[in-house]
Structure formats: C-alpha cells, structure tokens
Amino acid sequence: MFAKLKLAVAAAVLLCASAAAVAGDYYVDITNKTGYTITYLYVSPETSNYWEEDVLGQEGLLRPGKTQRVNLSGYKTPIFDIRLVNENDDRYTFWKVNVSEHNLTVKPDDRDDD
C-alpha cells in the first residue's frame, strides 16, 4: 500500500512539473520614448501569424515618457513579437523579443521604414 501511495505522489509531482513547463507567466515593461502618443500596442507569440488584440484597450494610450507593463499569461515561450502604432499611424515593430530577459524602450529610430 505504501508503495502505491509513493507512486501516486511521484506521478502527481511529475504531472505538475510538466504542466509548469507547458505554460508560463511573463511580463514586459514598454517605455515610450518616441515623442508621440502610442495608440495601439499588440503583443503576439512569435509563432503566430496574426497580431493579438490591442493590449492598451479601448481607452488606453501610452503617452511619451510613460511605461506600460504588459502581463502575458499561459504562453509556452517568452518569445513575442511586439508592434506599437502612434497617433500618426507610424509603426514600431520588434520581432522575437525575449520578455524574460528584456524590457523594451521604443525610440524614434525604431520606427518601421515602410
């Protein structure tokens, strides 16, 4: 009986450990140093072909000099693509950002060339 209990506990520990390896909680602090108000902020897993919803929300703005923390829960990897759009529709796109290692400061020189 004790051996079965030990086996059940070991299985439960392995199950919990594998679940933790599947999904993680991350965040990234994004600082706006562009000189313009950011009106849209998209963060998507780097494996996605589409941008996820605007994390600033319907009333949200990221004003010049301000920082926005973006919480990212339930993702398998800390690698994300990030796009910001300012009040003039200029875009700033960052590919494959490891949010577990880096925060992001967006500057005028980061503007997309298109």
For each feature predicted by the language model, list its residue ranges:
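Bacterial N-terminal signal peptides that target proteins for export
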Residues: 1-9
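N-terminal signal peptide c-region/cleavage motif recognized by signal peptidases
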Residues: 17-18
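Boundary at the C-terminal end of the N-terminal hydrophobic targeting segment
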Residues: 21-25
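Asparagine-centered strand-capping/turn motif at beta-strand->loop junctions
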Residues: 30-35
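Short acidic/proline- and small/hydrophobic-mixed sequence motifs that coincide with surface turns
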Residues: 36-40, 92
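A short, solvent-exposed beta-strand micro-motif common in secreted/extracellular proteins
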Residues: 77-87
